[in-house]
């Protein structure tokens, strides 16, 4: 397996320009950013934790006097090569083992020769986004979270060309909301941070304004209350999911997924039907065996945080070889991302008890 390890320190993005690389002012800002990064990396040679500390900083607000031409999407080669060492070895091993297991089965077989790129997720680097590319083309992603015991868990993974936290949709949303000037710049002192709350979320803080939350997939504005509704509880994060640990080893079964990708908004008759009961991951799996397409609707005001309502079209089972009955298996359910070719896989326990399940009407059942 060929891995090109990139470590992106742009978990926190600051007020500045979204101009393209051909703009001379943007190029000058990239040069300044590269020099700054070089200084950070030089410091890391003296103290290896310097880069890791910089990446784990959850919120560094750009001063009002900062250069307004600062690029939000600096992707210089010096960043790629110099700071990859900040990715913990334990995370690398867990990710590589996970990708190896997935690549043994369709539709993940292209991942066998994939390149992996790592980006920390805030606050406090409690998560990592790992993007998967093959010959420069996006193939999928993994989101890995830190557990309370210091290990790692597989919080989510996905297959397809639409990746979380893509800058393009975010740029369009900020412009549509009138938050950027004609040159694509945010007000000085602005802060953009990647968050994971059960779904990818951009947290946008602007001077003298309420914090905005924007979907990390489709750039839809989310209600503020949704962030708390979907926030992961780290105390129970390792239950019923693929987890790293010296006593753990996991084997992925071939996923069972229907070809049909129903959209809950195309046929709302499911709203008039009775909800189904799933009190555990195994019960949810049995529902999917009986009804190939279900719809999940979150309870309360948590729909936006989960990205719900959404369809469930299958599952993938992971078997533990740790010998522990409590960790015998983990079930991840398949969720087609609307209007894309991407399918998300979420741990079944994340949904059980957090909403209701309905049978999707139509040909799939």
Regions found by a protein language model. Give the residues of each.
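Bacterial N-terminal signal peptides
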Residues: 37-46
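Hydrophilic extracytoplasmic domains
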Residues: 277-365
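Exposed beta-strand-loop-beta-strand "reactive/processing" segments of non-cytosolic proteins
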Residues: 105-148, 190-215
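Short, non-transmembrane alpha-helical segments in secretory-pathway proteins
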Residues: 65-121, 159-188, 240-306
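ATP-dependent carboxylate-amine ligase
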Residues: 4, 34-36
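Sec-dependent signal peptide cleavage junction
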Residues: 47-59
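N-terminal secretory signal peptides that target proteins for export/translocation
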Residues: 1-28
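A short, surface-exposed interaction/processing loop segment used at functional sites
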Residues: 142-180, 214-259, 337-365
